[in-house]
Amino acid sequence: MALQDESLGIDQLSVDYDYLVYRISDRVKSLELEATRLVQRQNELVGQVSERVIDENIERFRGVLRGLDELEEYFAMMEQIGMITDSFKERLDSAMAALK
């Protein structure tokens, strides 16, 4: 029963990891697209700069920065998953050694 629980845990960890990688990839693409749009818009407005436009762009870039903060959290989650898998590998190696 414990082995089956461990197997389900590994499966869930794998699913969680894949989903996290997908979310990171999706978020990176989204942020890249938004940053590209902002830079293109900024270039278009170089000749027509106004304080209002600058403030709007600053707020949008702050949004991009918030998105990057989210990405940092995702990478921290990935690091935690790595630590969990390392710990599991050590326990598995220990269990295998005990069985020999």
UniProtKB/Swiss-Prot annotation:
TM ranges: none
Subunit structure: Component of the biogenesis of lysosome-related organelles complex-1 (BLOC-1).
Keyword annotations of the record: Coiled coil, Cytoplasm, Transport
GO CC terms in record: BLOC-1 complex; endosome
Domain of life: Eukaryota
Annotated coiled-coil segments of the chain: 25-46
Transport recorded as keyword: yes
InterPro entries reported in the protein's UniProt record: CNL1
Primary location class: cytoplasm
GO biological process: endosome organization; regulation of protein localization
Family the entry assigns: Belongs to the BLOC1S4 family.
Name by which UniProt lists this protein: Biogenesis of lysosome-related organelles complex 1 subunit CNL1
Subcellular location: Cytoplasm
UniProt function note: Component of the biogenesis of lysosome-related organelles complex-1 (BLOC-1), a complex that is involved in endosomal cargo sorting.
